[in-house]
Amino acid sequence: MKRHEAREKALQALFQIDVGRIPPDEALHNVTGGGDIDPFLRQLVFGVVEHQEEIDELLRANLEKWTLERVANVDRAILRMATYEMKYADDVPVSVSLDEAVELAKKFGDWKSGSFVNGVLSKVKAALQK
């Protein structure tokens, strides 16, 4: 599975976990149809779940005029996943994480999602580089 596809499936799983309040294993089963789970996909989903408190704290610090709870569900899942990658996935360049997140936002979010996600993650990137 290519990493782009793994990110799409991770987004779908994280959305289910957040909105449907289902366990990560069940969400992964749902998005893979019960098939083999790509290691990168598993890393993204469990990494976000494991570090969600720190991720959310970082996102809250970089949201202007928004609360994390008011952010659209799909955008919130994208922001969490990209922030996880930027902070914890050493094998993924930060610029790749940011670009992939913007593409996912354009595909799965509304017409403003791409620029919103780009703006927030650019601030997260700057905060992480301090």
UniProtKB/Swiss-Prot annotation:
Alphabetical keyword list? RNA-binding, Transcription, Transcription antitermination, Transcription regulation
- Which cysteines link up through disulfide bonds? none
Highest taxon in the source lineage: Bacteria
Q: Please name the taxonomic classification of the source.
A: Bacteria, Bacillati, Bacillota, Bacilli, Bacillales
Gene3D superfamilies given for it? NusB-like
Matching InterPro entries: NusB-like_sf, NusB_fam, NusB_RsmB_TIM44
Organism, per UniProt?
Answer: Geobacillus kaustophilus (strain HTA426)
Per the record, a Pfam family?
A: NusB
Chain ranges passing through the membrane: none
Q: Which GO terms describe its molecular function?
A: RNA binding
Q: Name one GO cellular component term.
A: cytosol
- The name of this protein is Transcription antitermination protein NusB
Q: Which biological processes are named by the entry's GO terms?
A: DNA-templated transcription termination; transcription antitermination
Q: What does this protein do?
A: Involved in transcription antitermination. Required for transcription of ribosomal RNA (rRNA) genes. Binds specifically to the boxA antiterminator sequence of the ribosomal RNA (rrn) operons.
Q: Which family does it belong to?
A: Belongs to the NusB family.
